[in-house]
């Protein structure tokens, strides 16, 4: 790069020039110093926290961080309409088209991916990684990793990892979903733990369930206080409550029965509506 005339830069030998905006200085051996804003392919890059107010803000992208006011500090946003509505929010990070688009005053959110946390207004301390993750969230202290993860949630303190995990959660809080479409249909239930692909997939309002293993408690809708560990354990349970199944296919056919305990592979596998049973051992009962 060869500075010419103090107003242009000559690039290579083609003779193409680039205008130097106000606030740009060139010093021998000191490189290029930028103290204002500049434009890259139509998008404005705001530097030094000087656009238009606030401290230590960095933004790149059309309308990114355009609403920032005094008191809105330490925000980093990259992408078209990313963080557009942030006014006094502090310490937010948004990367992706429409990421954190509606956020105004909340702080310490991380949104990475197209439309991640896009309608969040006041929820704080959320982490959303993946397109549409936590898209409609208004709650706080949620962690969502994966495309569409916790897309609708308004509750708080949820953790969801995996595409479409906790996707339909609206008001449910303190849920943990790890795996593809784990707890996908959950709406308002609290305190569920689902680990494994499609575990607790159909659960809507059943609370205090623990499902560990692929498709464990997959059909459960309103059943509560169940513990199911093992692939396909309690596979058919829909409304049964307070059951314990430990082992692959344990209590697999249970639908509405309560208060059963099955320990061992295929234990109580054929039970559907019987209650207060205890079976220990492979294929017991």
Language model segments and positions:
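Short, intrinsically disordered N-terminal pre-domain segments
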Residues: 1-2
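Sequence context surrounding c-type heme c attachment/ligation sites in exported
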Residues: 14
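Short, surface-exposed terminal/edge motifs of secreted or surface/virion proteins that either
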Residues: 17-25
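Glycine- and small/polar-enriched repetitive beta-structure motifs of secreted/surface proteins
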Residues: 35-285
């Amino acid at each position: 790069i060869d500075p010419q005339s103090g107003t242009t830069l000559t690039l290579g030998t083609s003779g193409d020039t680039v205008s130097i905006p106000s606030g740009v200085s060139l010093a021998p051996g000191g490189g290029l110093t930028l103290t204002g804003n500049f434009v890259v392919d139509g998008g404005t890059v705001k530097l030094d926290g000087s656009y238009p107010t606030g401290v230590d803000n960095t933004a790149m992208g059309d309308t990114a961080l355009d609403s920032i006011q005094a008191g809105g500090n330490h925000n980093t946003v990259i992408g078209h309409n990313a963080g557009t509505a942030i006014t006094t929010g502090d310490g937010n990070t948004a990367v992706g088209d429409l990421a954190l688009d509606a956020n105004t005053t909340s702080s310490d959110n991380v949104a990475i991916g197209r439309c991640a946390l896009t309608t969040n207004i006041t929820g704080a301390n959320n982490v959303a990684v993946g397109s549409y993750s936590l898209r409609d969230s208004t709650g706080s202290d949620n962690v969502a990793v994966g495309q569409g993860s916790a897309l609708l949630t308004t509750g708080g303190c949820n953790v969801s990892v995996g595409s479409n995990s906790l996707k339909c959660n609206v008001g449910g809080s303190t849920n943990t979903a790890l795996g593809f479409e784990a707890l996908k249909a959950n709406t308002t239930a609290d305190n569920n733990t689902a680990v494994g692909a499609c575990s607790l997939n159909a659960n809507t309002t059943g609370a205090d369930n623990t499902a560990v293993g692929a498709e464990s408690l997959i059909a459960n809708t309103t059943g509560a206080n169940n513990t199911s560990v093992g692939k396909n354990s309690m596979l058919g349970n829909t409304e049964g409550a307070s059951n314990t199944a430990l082992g692959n296919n344990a209590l697999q056919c249970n639908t509405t029965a309560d208060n059963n305990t099955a320990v061992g592979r295929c234990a109580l596998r054929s039970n559907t509506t019987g209650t207060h049973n205890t079976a220990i051992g492979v294929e017991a009962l």
